[in-house]
Amino acid sequence: MAGLNVSLSFFFATFTLCEAARRASKALLPVGAYEVFAREAMRTLVELGPWAGDFGPDLLLTLLFLLFLAHGVTLDGASANPTVSLQEFLMAEESLPGTLLKLAAQGLGMQAACTLTRLCWAWELSDLHLLQSLMAQSCSSALRTSVPHGALVEAACAFCFHLTLLHLRHSPPAYSGPAVALLVTVTAYTAGPFTSAFFNPALAASVTFACSGHTLLEYVQVYWLGPLTGMVLAVLLHQGRLPHLFQRNLFYGQKNKYRAPRGKPAPASGDTQTPAKGSSVREPGRSGVEGPHSS
């Protein structure tokens, strides 16, 4: 029970400190620096840092749901996920310099989270932390299936995640936050036994890239190329194109929003109209009074 209390305390302390740092950055930094850099670094830290608490499987899914739910409410749209930043670039919602700054901020947040994790384990606040500190140099891989299957699983998880984000991007946080949190929790429960269901290159690089069992190239194929492929497919399915790269819709035909009214075309000035059947036409030069020989 003491270990559980330590883990929960560490979880909420990390989240509270990151939220305080985010608010201070928003107040002190220029708007561009905060939106592009600081909030991404803080979200990456708050997403990766709390897992140093080493939760058991009985609490992991519940805390994962609460973490993503809190993210949706407090972190101003920051993603802490490189594939989400690349999605915004492909959707023409972010410029290339802004995207590169977000990726750099996420890398910085990842390094800060790793440092925080090692520091927490070194304190040996619980028996689990002591065990993690001893096993840090010989951790086991999160990839527990073949490389092609793992890449397919990560791509499928990322596809569902990004397609949901695209459908809910204009929805109020009160609806999108719980929906995304529930999706991430269900995905982690379903795909967790195979790849741990990261579908986040920064999170995967922080947690499992240093572990033995697979080469760096195999990890890159599963945890970087897999989510990137799933994200691109989600954008293509949702938009029919990659807006930043292609203007032409590759999948869906575009219908004209404004349709011309269906009316009879106006006759040209030189056109002669055909008289209607049964109507009389007067010849030029004849008066309206009929002659004596008319019957």
From Swiss-Prot:
Keyword Lipid biosynthesis on entry: no
Topology feature Extracellular, residues: 42-55, 143-145, 192-194, 207-223
InterPro entries: AQP11/12_channel, Aquaporin-like, Aquaporin_11/12, Aquaporin_12, MIP
Region (Disordered): 257-295
Keyword terms, alphabetized: Membrane, Repeat, Transmembrane, Transmembrane helix, Transport
SUPFAM superfamilies: Aquaporin-like
Motif (NPA 2) on chain: 200-202
Entry's Gene Ontology molecular function annotations: channel activity; water channel activity
CC per GO annotation: cytoplasm; membrane
Intramembrane feature spans: 77-114, 195-206
Top-level lineage group: Eukaryota
Principal location listed in the UniProt entry: membrane
Cell compartment(s), UniProt: Membrane
Record topological domains on the Cytoplasmic side: 1-22, 75-76, 115-120, 167-174, 245-295
Transmembrane regions: 23-41, 56-74, 121-142, 146-166, 175-191, 224-244
Assembly with partners or alone: Homotetramer; each monomer provides an independent water pore.
Role, per record: Putative aquaporin. Could form homotetrameric transmembrane channels, with each monomer independently mediating water transport across the plasma membrane along its osmotic gradient.
Entry note about domains: Aquaporins contain two tandem repeats each containing three membrane-spanning domains and a pore-forming loop with the signature motif Asn-Pro-Ala (NPA).
Family of the protein in this entry: Belongs to the MIP/aquaporin (TC 1.A.8) family. AQP11/AQP12 subfamily.
Protein name per its UniProtKB record: Putative aquaporin-12B
UniProt lineage: Eukaryota, Metazoa, Chordata, Craniata, Vertebrata
